[in-house]
Amino acid sequence: MMKSVSTRLCHSVSPARIGALMRFGFTQRQAQFLVHVLVFSGVFLERQYRMFTGLAHGQKTQDFLAKLVTAGYATPITPGALHRGRLYHVQYKPLYEAIGEPNNRHRKAASLGRFVERLMLLDAVLVDRRYGWLGTEQDKRTYFREALEKDLPDDWYPHLTFGTGEQKTTRFFPDKLPIGVPLKDDWRHVFLYLATREVPTDFRVFLLRHSDLLTSVDEWTVRVLLPRRFRKAAALYRYAVRDAFLMPLTPRDTEELDWYFRARRGEVVCPAQDPDLDLATAARRFSAARFEAAYRMWQERDVQALWALQSPTLRDHLQRGQGRVEFAELPHQYLQLTPLVGVPGGVEKGLMEGDNLPTA
């Protein structure tokens, strides 16, 4: 169950952060836009600034862009052989320090493909003002700790752990994808996912990584953002949802899967309880794409990663309408750089031509 929280926790673009950037000489509207950029993308297009402010391609817009560049706040990038169009990377560290994000990765250089992905996420946030949007790890953690009536263990939040011993570091919400939280009397939360490949291998891991948290959220939507080149992949993404949430494993399945994963990793294991189950048989039984995603999660969290696969809670959420999966096609071309998003994918195990892929 969830409870209402203060509005100040529902927005990463907070009045305090806007005020901090206004001290650099920006107007309130300019500062508000820049906080969106710093938190959600690190890069932006002139089109996005004009859409947010309602300004035309005129002197006010050009003055704002010129100020960013001449002051060293942002670097203009003119990609492509013809250098048509321009994106702006806001990399000035004092701006990030001013909003309490001195180590945010958005200020660092990245590939053009990654920049385009971030532009897409920024668009998705800017066009939907029905929700408050959270972009930083700390903002998400603070919100859910306050909003959930029952405290969740840290392991229930999406996370990745690196290193061992004193060098062990845990990053929460490592996908760095915006989360929309309800305002006023609504209870629905929106978890964005940007499709960067035709084959939804990473999406399967995303679903498993968020499954514990989703079971604790009263109403939720996973919104898959589809660049034009991937719009035909929606069926595969629906199939991935069905695998993750509509087909819970039995306790015996989980036990055998854990046994197989340990043997696959090279551990010395006792014979399986099923005398007919050997490594070759298990490899065939658990060859589908859903189990490859489960193996990736198991490598991170051991058998605990498999427990969520037994729960019928998310299946029940989807069947009752508490949970939804929706697809939003991104309409823009992004300086003709959309082909740089992701890489060509292969064929997932377990899918055959002509498979009926129901909508979740």
Task: Describe the role of every protein-language-model region.
Residues 23-25, 72, 99-103, 125, ...:
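Glycine-centered secondary-structure boundary/capping sites
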Residues 90-118:
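Short, amphipathic alpha-helical interaction segments positioned at domain boundaries
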Residues 1-95:
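Basic, Lys/Arg-rich alpha-helical nucleic-acid-recognition elements, primarily the DNA-binding modules
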Residues 37, 53, 65-69, 124-132, ...:
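Hydrophobic, Leu/Ile/Phe/Ala-enriched alpha-helical segments that form helix-helix packing faces
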Residues 10-13, 57-60, 109, 113-116, ...:
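Non-membrane alpha-helical secondary structure
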Residues 33, 68, 88, 124, ...:
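Generic structural hydrophobic/aromatic packing signal, biased to beta-strands
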Residues 109-203:
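Exposed, interaction-prone assembly regions rather than primary DNA-binding/catalytic cores
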Residues 181-360:
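C-terminal regulatory/effector modules of DNA-binding transcriptional regulators
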